[in-house]
Amino acid sequence: MKTLSILDTIIKIPEKIEIHPTTTEYIYTITGPLGSSSINLKKLDKNGIACINFDIQNKQVLIRSLYPKYNGLYKKLIENKFLGVSRGFCVYLEIVGVGYRAALLSSSLQNSTKDTNDTIVLKLGHSHDIHYKVPNGVRVFLQSPSEICIFGVDLNQVTQVAHSIRNTRPPSVYKGKGIRYTNEKIVTKTGKRK
C-alpha cells in the first residue's frame, strides 16, 4: 500500500512587500512599491486541497499539501502577486494593417468628471471606431499608433484586458492583418488559386 507524505513548500516574502489580513477571514492584502493587490485563499483553493499559511512575523508563506503539483501551482500564483506589486506586468500588442491605428483618450480630456478610466479608440477597418474603456488597476500606453503597452499589478487582469483588445480584430488567417501580441507568430493560409 502506498503511503501519502505531506509536502511543504516555503516562499520567502521579499523585503519591500507587506502582507496584511483583512476583516474577512480568508482575504489578505499584499502591498508593495507599485500598489496593492488582494488574494482570496478560499477562492484560490476551492476544494481545500492545500493548507496555505501566511507567517507575517517570519516573512514567509507555508504551503502544505499531499499533491506536489498543487504546491507548485499555488507557489507560482502567490509569487506572481509578489512580482506584480514589486515590478508589475506588461503585455505588448501590435496593430498590423493599412490605416489600422489606436489613439488614447485620457480621462482628464473627457467631459465626464466621474470617469477616471482611460479609453482606447481603435480604427480597425470597421465602419465605426471601437472605444474600449480600460478598467481600474490597468494602465495603457501607446508607444506609436500601432503599438500598445498594457501595464498593471495583477497578471490575470492585464492579460484579460490584452485579450479583450486583441479580440476586437484578431489577426486574419489570410493576410495577418489585425491586433496581435508582439511575439505572436501568425500562421497564414494560402488563398484560392485559379
Curated annotation (Swiss-Prot):
This chain belongs to the protein called Large ribosomal subunit protein uL6m
**Predominant localisation class:** mitochondrion
Q: Which InterPro entries match?
A: Ribosomal_uL6-like, Ribosomal_uL6-like_a/b-dom_sf, Ribosomal_uL6_a/b-dom, Ribosomal_uL6_bac-type, Ribosomal_uL6_CS
Q: Name one GO biological process term.
A: cytoplasmic translation
Keywords in alphabetical order, please.
Mitochondrion, Ribonucleoprotein, Ribosomal protein
- Which is one Gene Ontology cellular component term of this protein? ribonucleoprotein complex
Q: PROSITE patterns in the record, alphabetically?
A: RIBOSOMAL_L6_1
An annotated Gene Ontology molecular function: structural constituent of ribosome
Pfam hit, one: Ribosomal_L6
